[in-house]
């Protein structure tokens, strides 16, 4: 890892002015993945989850930066951050990173990000193509080892060592939570909550009717 560069005043930008996604398909995948991770870890005191957050691994050099579509850091507290500065986080890098491809992504960008994540300590790196619903996975077998490719033949049923998320590739790409539930979009979660509320309201109405009938019989 490169040594920190000592400067008195360094500005670390919080945004590059670019949108989160280039199209609705990419946006849906990013928000689905980030939403599920937020939902799962939001009550854990030592897990930080972020979406499209600038990550600066080297103090004093803001040119070394990337913004994963979703990242998970174990061993760091949750909470709002303007960016993720490694030297302010006890040197703990994101262990898991997701990138969702856009039409403008190039092979050069792909290689550069893989090298970045390998150099700065990412343990698991998942690249999802939302158009073809395919995934490339890279994992680190040892702390000092390289990120190796998970062969496509072994990706179906592959389980993330850190997250416990299962990748299913038999019919497109499906991500399953550790309890076997497919990842849900925000709309799926909202509809699920509305359905639960409707069911609760119906049950409450039935209970009211039953109580009223018992009251009438007692009279």
Report residues per predicted region.
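A structured, charge-rich N-terminal accessory region that forms the first stable segment of a protein
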Residues: 22, 27-40, 48
């Amino acid at each position: 890892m490169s040594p920190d560069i000592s400067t008195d005043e360094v500005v670390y930008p919080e945004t590059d002015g670019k949108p989160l996604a280039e199209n609705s398909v990419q946006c849906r995948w990013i928000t689905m993945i980030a939403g599920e991770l937020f939902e799962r870890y939001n009550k854990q005191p030592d897990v930080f989850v972020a979406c499209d957050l600038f990550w600066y691994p080297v103090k004093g050099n803001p040119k070394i930066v990337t913004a994963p579509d979703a990242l998970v850091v174990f061993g760091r507290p949750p909470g709002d951050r303007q960016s993720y500065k490694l030297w302010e986080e006890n040197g703990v890098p994101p262990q898991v990173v997701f990138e969702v491809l856009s039409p403008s992504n190039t092979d050069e960008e792909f290689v550069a990000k893989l090298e970045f994540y390998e150099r700065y300590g990412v343990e698991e790196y998942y690249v999802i193509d939302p158009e073809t619903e395919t995934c490339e996975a890279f994992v680190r077998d040892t702390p000092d080892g390289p990120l190796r490719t998970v062969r496509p033949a072994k990706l179906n049923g592959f389980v993330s060592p850190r997250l416990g998320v299962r990748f299913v590739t038999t019919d497109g790409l499906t991500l399953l939570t550790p309890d076997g539930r497919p990842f849900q979009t925000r709309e799926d979660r909202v509809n699920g909550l509305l359905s639960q509320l409707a069911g609760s309201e119906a049950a409450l109405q039935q209970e009211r009717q039953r109580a009223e009938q018992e009251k009438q019989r007692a009279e």
